[in-house]
């Protein structure tokens, strides 16, 4: 018989999941005076690819920004690689792709310079060795931007900016890759390139947490979906399947205005 919570000495916290790369427990967070996360539990284990889904304003981006420390928790616990957040220092193990931003943040830079910035945490005193340069080149190749390495990022399209941001995260050879809306506003060709790059990471055992609006070409890679609604987890399991008219090509999303008390519309992804 599995041990029950009552078997633990009174007052002892639950044991940590030793396979967890990310572990949020009872996490709450606010943006200004507005509560956004309302006591969510989220565990991402070694080697998993987890999609974080939900309507706009459900708390998806706030959740991932809490994981990397950009939004502080107001209550609850966070551990990374088994280490409580306040003691975690090994940020080189984490690659992060932010939501909807330009590759250089308005600073003049070449594609290679931006991607190289993602490698600096792995270097000594910021000096690139041969292995570092090889990692940068490999990251550029993975996203199909090696031939644009010397170009200014100001000359790139939106989809190419997104490729560069992903290459920057990959250049550090992370153990955990967190991507916030990596497919947003990206053309189909770029989506396929990014899916291919992600497949390579999954094959080498990288743990991945994705915020998505549409599964698209990433669907075969997803192990688990966690759906948020109003800052609460309402689903944690296999990705919802498309049904009815929503399964038709070109309708790979969910309308978030369904009655909250009704069975959620299940499509390619709950957005």
What kind of feature is each model-predicted range?
Residues 177-181:
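Catalytic Walker B motif of ABC-type/P-loop ATPase nucleotide-binding domains
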Residues 116, 130-148:
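Conserved ABC ATPase "signature" region
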Residues 152-156:
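Conserved ABC ATPase signature
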Residues 212-213:
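H-loop/switch region of ABC-family ATPase nucleotide-binding domains
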Residues 218-220:
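A short, surface-exposed alpha-helical micro-motif characterized by mixed small hydrophobic
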Residues 173:
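Conserved catalytic motifs of ABC-family nucleotide-binding domains
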């Amino acid at each position: 018989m599995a041990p029950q919570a009552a078997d633990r000495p009174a007052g002892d916290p639950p044991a940590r999941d030793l396979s967890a790369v990310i572990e949020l427990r009872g996490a709450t967070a606010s943006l200004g005076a507005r509560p956004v996360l309302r006591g969510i539990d989220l565990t991402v284990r070694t080697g998993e690819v987890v999609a974080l889904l939900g309507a706009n304003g459900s708390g998806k981006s706030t959740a991932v920004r809490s994981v990397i420390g950009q939004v502080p928790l107001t209550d609850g616990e966070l551990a990374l690689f088994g280490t409580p957040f306040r003691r975690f220092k090994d940020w080189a193990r984490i690659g992060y792709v932010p939501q909807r931003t330009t590759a250089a943040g308005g600073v003049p830079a070449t594609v290679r310079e931006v991607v190289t910035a993602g490698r600096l945490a792995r270097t000594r005193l910021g000096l690139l060795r041969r292995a570092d340069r090889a990692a940068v080149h490999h990251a550029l190749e993975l996203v199909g931007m090696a031939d644009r390495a010397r170009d200014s990022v100001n000359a790139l399209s939106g989809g190419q900016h997104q490729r560069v941001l992903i290459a920057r995260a990959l250049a550090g050879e992370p153990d955990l890759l967190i991507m916030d809306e990596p497919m947003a506003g990206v053309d189909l060709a770029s989506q396929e390139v990014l899916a291919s790059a992600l497949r390579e990471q999954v094959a080498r055992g990288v743990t991945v947490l994705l915020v998505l609006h549409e599964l698209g070409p990433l669907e075969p890679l997803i192990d688990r979906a966690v759906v948020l609604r109003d800052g609460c987890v309402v689903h944690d399991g296999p990705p919802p399947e498309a049904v009815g008219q929503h399964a038709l090509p070109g309708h790979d999303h969910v309308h978030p205005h369904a009655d909250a008390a009704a069975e959620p519309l299940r499509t390619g992804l709950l957005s």
